Amino acid sequence: MSSGKIAQVVGPVVDVMFASGDKLPEINNALIVYKDSDKKQKIVLEVALELGDGMVRTIAMESTDGLTRGLEVLDTGRAISVPVGKETLGRVFNVLGETIDLEEPFAEDVDRQPIHKKAPSFDELSTSSEILETGIKVIDLLAPYLKGGKVGLFGGAGVGKTVLIQELIHNIAQEHGGISVFTGVGERTREGNDLYWEMKESGVIEKTAMVFGQMNEPPGARMRVALTGLTIAEYFRDVEGQDVLLFIDNIFRFTQAGSEVSALLGRMPSAVGYQPTLATEMGQLQERITSTQKGSVTSIQAIYVPADDYTDPAPATAFAHLDSTTNLERKLTQMGIYPAVDPLASSSRALSPEIVGEEHYAVATEVQRVLQRYRELQDIIAILGMDELSDEEKTLVGRARRIQFFLSQNFNVAEQFTGLPGSYVPVADTVRGFKEILEGKYDDLPEDAFRSVGPIEDVIKKAEKMGF
């Protein structure tokens, strides 16, 4: 095990000098430095660059407070390795695979795998055309998810990405019954804590591994924690042959962490100050999140959109890797429509008659047509009023508003805040409900009866309570 000494500490970036003649550590190797003489406080560094003349530049996975020049650094000779397998289920880790749930740490002989790997080769890949039912009407109808596919939840600050991902965990993890891996990347610690206790109460935690590198942690941890969660998911896919659900909240923070250290590593920034290696880093992560002939990984990723600008390089780079996109729209939150999913901007590769069936496809495209026409008529309504519309257009606007409200529903995970029970709506009930609205069966019911309900039967009950 070769050793060197700290030459420079600049925030999360540490330069280490190795003696001439010593073997230099390889890129991505883990180095260990002890802050105290009795070797109880250690910090893990990861090699990012080799500068020449025995100097390597590393990124710290923990806070560099207390590090000084001259401290000894040991090369472990391998990349950061994390525990994998059944022992990880029901547990909470950090980026290094250390348990942070106050329970017994892992045994020394637990199976471990490095977080840096190659993506599966082309001939190992497998595609699926099976729909993953979420129980959320707007998603199942207009932007359905594929089993073994990749989904992005796009939205600005405070439009409901984390609540939506928590509802998907609640619905899919319980219905799916398989293995789930949740990776918190640079998000609020409070939300992670709430999610942990919620999963513990519901019993889902027994089939879930949770990995966190939250907002307060250094950029090195936030940059690598997604790989830690992915490594655990890959093991269940490749070795155990399981169908795995991988939740990542938030992919933008992974990019943001990379941009924080990029300038300190000596790289010239590119567009909007992001790292020049943005597309490469995103590709290396996303290409590993895939389904093979051994098992599948269905990934659902929350992606923050800075200032609601979808042309920002971070969300724009992620778009290219996804099968389905669920776009959250601030205007809908202002109208009190939750989940605030934009039915026209969201899309899915799965919305085709060959995959969802002729009836589902016909209903979904007609819903989109009606909503698109309503959007076009809104300017006329705002300037001239409803009276200027033809009878046919007035009917269409009425149905469009009912559809818009019917796309909302109460969430199980939000019940503690709203006091209203959540609902899970099977795909068949969703398609039937929208088909009947399009046929004009409920034109006489008030629009408010369609707001925040489950299946169409709930609308009828709500209308009866309102005196209709």
Swiss-Prot record:
Kindly give the membrane topology term recorded for this protein.
Answer: Peripheral membrane protein
Q: Which CDD domains match?
A: ATP-synt_F1_beta_C (cd18110), ATP-synt_F1_beta_N (cd18115), F1-ATPase_beta_CD (cd01133)
Pfam families linked to this entry: ATP-synt_ab, ATP-synt_ab_N, ATP-synt_VA_C
The set of disulfide-linked cysteines is: none
The Enzyme Commission number assigned here is 7.1.2.2
- List cellular component terms (GO): plasma membrane; proton-transporting ATP synthase complex
Identify the keywords attached in UniProt to this record, alphabetized. ATP synthesis, ATP-binding, Cell membrane, CF(1), Hydrogen ion transport, Ion transport, Membrane, Nucleotide-binding, Translocase, Transport
Q: Which domain of life is it from?
A: Bacteria
InterPro entries documented for this protein: AAA+_ATPase (IPR003593), ATP-synt_VA_C (IPR055190), ATP_synth_F1_bsu (IPR005722), ATPase_a/bsu_AS (IPR020003), ATPase_alpha/beta_chains (IPR050053), ATPase_F1/V1/A1_a/bsu_N (IPR004100), ATPase_F1/V1/A1_a/bsu_N_sf (IPR036121), ATPase_F1/V1/A1_a/bsu_nucl-bd (IPR000194)
Listed GO MF terms: ATP binding; ATP hydrolysis activity; proton-transporting ATP synthase activity, rotational mechanism
Which residues participate in ATP binding? G155, G156, A157, G158, V159, G160, K161, T162
- Reaction catalysed? ATP + H2O + 4 H(+)(in) = ADP + phosphate + 5 H(+)(out)
Q: Where in the cell is it found?
A: Cell membrane
| NCBIfam families reported for this sequence | atpD
Of which family is this protein a member? Belongs to the ATPase alpha/beta chains family.
Describe the protein's quaternary organization and the partners it interacts with: F-type ATPases have 2 components, CF(1) - the catalytic core - and CF(0) - the membrane proton channel. CF(1) has five subunits: alpha(3), beta(3), gamma(1), delta(1), epsilon(1). CF(0) has three main subunits: a(1), b(2) and c(9-12). The alpha and beta chains form an alternating ring which encloses part of the gamma chain. CF(1) is attached to CF(0) by a central stalk formed by the gamma and epsilon chains, while a peripheral stalk is formed by the delta and b chains.
Task: Please give the function described in this protein's UniProt entry.
Answer: Produces ATP from ADP in the presence of a proton gradient across the membrane. The catalytic sites are hosted primarily by the beta subunits.
Q: What is this protein called?
A: ATP synthase subunit beta
Which species expresses this protein natively? Streptococcus pyogenes serotype M5 (strain Manfredo)
- Lineage from the top down? Bacteria, Bacillati, Bacillota, Bacilli, Lactobacillales
